[in-house]
Every structure is written in C-alpha cells, then in structure tokens.
C-alpha cells in the first residue's frame, strides 16, 4: 500500500500455513514535514518502532519514501525466507514507479492489480473479518498492524463493504496492504503444505 508523504508505505506479506494465513507487516515512514510533528500527529513513536524492526524512517533529505529501499526490503523478505512469490498485490494509485522497477528486476513475480474500491474489496473484506474471528488469519502482534486494525472501521455503500478511517492521522495502511493480498488469497485452497510451522512462530520467528 503506497504512501509518499503523510501515509505509511506498507508491505504486508500473507503467507499460507497448513490451515490458516499468517499476516505480518513492515512500514516505511516519510518525514517531509518533520518526524517529531508526524509522531505527535499520529500518536506513534516511529523512532521506537524502527529500533524494534517494525518500520524504517526514510533517510532521504526530501523526506519522501525511497522506492529503491522498498524494493530492497521486499527482496530481503523473499530471499531470507526462501519464499516462492505467488503474487505482488498492489493498489495502482502512485505505484507506477515501483511497478516498473519490479517488472525490470523480477519478471518472474506475478503482479496483481487490486483497486481499493468497494466493488473489488467487498467480498475479501467480509471474508477477512470472518476468518480473523475463526482463526484462519493470524498475526504476530505487530504493533503497526494492530494499530491499523484498531483505527479501521467498515463502511458500507451500494457496492458493499470496505474499510476506512475516521481521520487522516489514523493510519490503516498496513491493513489496507493486507486486504490487497487477501483479495487474491481468500480464494486459494489450503493444500496442507504451508510455509511455516506453528512451532517456528511460537519460537519467535519473524518475516523480517
């Protein structure tokens, strides 16, 4: 889920287990209008979360997110975890530059456009909600992902249901990114050959 200045740029891997999906997230934080003011406005210490490995604060003088660093982080996740990438799911808004970079460097990665509209996300959002309740989606307690879930509410219109936020400082980007992935994943059957074991997760395994 792309963010440039005010929002987070969130990467939320959805990993198939034996009988559930494991969701985690990593965010990039812009500093265009100052990190201190952003932390105060969002009510989040990104500085502390960066130390804990949940996010990365941009080092560009402009304060915007560096697409090169985003792609490097995705590559790190894939290589360190030895993933077989079945899809890079993305909202096309502001994704053009990174899309071109991925196409050039990783033509083997399927690119799947998921527009963040109610019509597209209605069924995935309903299924995501139900699957979280039924234990078919689990996550590690990631604080930025937890914050996003707490900040989100479901909005219903004539086309169905999707998530939204009450105000701009309520960040939901990690959850938006997860729903982009789940728009594809929720249709996938479990084949009993999940990527990780419960034991690895319980022993503190991390995707990052």
Give the residues covered by each predicted segment:
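Short, surface-exposed amphipathic charged segments that create phosphate/polyanion-binding patches used
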Residues: 124-134
């Amino acid at each position: 889920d792309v963010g440039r200045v005010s929002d987070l740029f969130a990467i939320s891997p959805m990993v198939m287990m034996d009988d559930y999906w494991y969701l985690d997230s990593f965010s990039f934080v812009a500093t265009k209008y100052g990190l201190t003011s952003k932390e105060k406005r969002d009510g989040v210490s990104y500085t502390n979360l960066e130390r804990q490995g949940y996010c990365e604060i941009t080092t560009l003088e402009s304060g915007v997110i560096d697409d090169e660093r985003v792609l490097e982080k995705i590559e790190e996740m894939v290589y360190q975890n030895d993933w077989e990438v079945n899809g890079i799911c993305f909202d096309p808004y502001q994704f053009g530059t990174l899309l071109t970079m991925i196409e050039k460097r990783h033509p083997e990665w399927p690119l799947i456009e998921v527009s963040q509209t109610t019509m597209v996300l209605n069924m995935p959002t309903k299924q995501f909600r139900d699957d979280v309740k039924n234990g078919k989606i689990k996550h590690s307690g990631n604080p930025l992902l937890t914050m996003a879930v707490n900040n989100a509410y479901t909005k219903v219109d004539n086309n169905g249901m999707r998530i939204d936020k009450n105000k701009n400082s309520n960040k939901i980007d990690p959850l938006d990114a997860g729903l982009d992935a789940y728009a594809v994943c929720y249709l996938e059957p479990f084949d009993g050959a999940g990527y990780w074991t419960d034991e690895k997760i319980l022993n503190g395994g991390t995707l990052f």
